[in-house]
Amino acid sequence: MLRVIGLGAVGSLFTYFLNRAGVVPEVVQRRRCGEFLFCVEGDCEKLKFREGGAADDVGYTIVAVKAYDSRSVVPHLKGVAVVAQNGIGGYEEIKEAYPNSVPAVVTYGVYREGCRAELRGVGEIYLPSAVSTLAELLERGGGRVRLVEDIEPYRWLKLAVNAAINAITALLQAPNGVIISSPYAQTLALEVAQEVLNVATALGVKMPRNPVEEVLRVASATAKNLSSTARDVAACAKTEIDYINGAVVKYGEALGVATPVNKALFNLIKARESLCNSG
């Protein structure tokens, strides 16, 4: 038995691949969808899953909730917890409470609205080699999966991309392509990526690709997409900024590495959240 916690963009993607591999997972979701559609190039399929969280024979629990909800999922964890989230920090919170946990990195682009999700960009799922059985299932279902011995470099590369794109697009309320079309936005984004690289280097993490180049590649490839943070800000919803730019600032302060652009963007998003909370 496999369990998926959170039927958002990432949770629905995993469920889709599992379905295609012949697996019907158990799903724990906050907002219940009796019927959930997953669409690829206009072709929509109804996801198959069991509602609940009562099964005991769970081999893997895929955690796909927002990073700030990490602690709330701990009572639902069984087997190996595979934590697929944005940013740095959510996995660490889960690992502290539930040691049998590993991180995952997802670079697919999925847009979710209500009880429907749409694949908007094919990427990859990076998993630690310790969860090869899960990797085989996802591959059987059509997922592009890479098993890696050390997943930390991939976590930091994704952090660099998210930190460089999400906050800027949220503040501008513009799709990711603004990072390419606006020299001002691009300057900020590349400074953010360089700061993340500096922090990662101080930690001894060597990213698999140059984060500055990766930001430009991703922004171009997803030019029409609106980042999750931009959508959260537009909806006056809580963002994951504490685990994205906030995490860069936190690690930078601990290591004595300056992160002024990340700090400015972090503070601006937090100020925007405060405006929403004040009415």
From Swiss-Prot:
GO biological process: coenzyme A biosynthetic process; pantothenate biosynthetic process
Function: Catalyzes the NAD(P)H-dependent reduction of ketopantoate into pantoic acid.
Similarity field: Belongs to the ketopantoate reductase family.
EC number: 1.1.1.169
Alphabetically ordered keywords of this record: Coenzyme A biosynthesis, Cytoplasm, NAD, NADP, Oxidoreductase
Catalytic activity field: (R)-pantoate + NAD(+) = 2-dehydropantoate + NADH + H(+); (R)-pantoate + NADP(+) = 2-dehydropantoate + NADPH + H(+)
Enzyme class: oxidoreductase
Protein name, entry field: 2-dehydropantoate 2-reductase
Active site: 158 (proton donor)
Native organism: Pyrobaculum aerophilum (strain ATCC 51768 / DSM 7523 / JCM 9630 / CIP 104966 / NBRC 100827 / IM2)
Binding site for NADP(+): 6-11, 66, 86, 240
Pathway: Cofactor biosynthesis; coenzyme A biosynthesis
NCBIfam families in the cross-refs: apbA_panE
Annotated localization: Cytoplasm
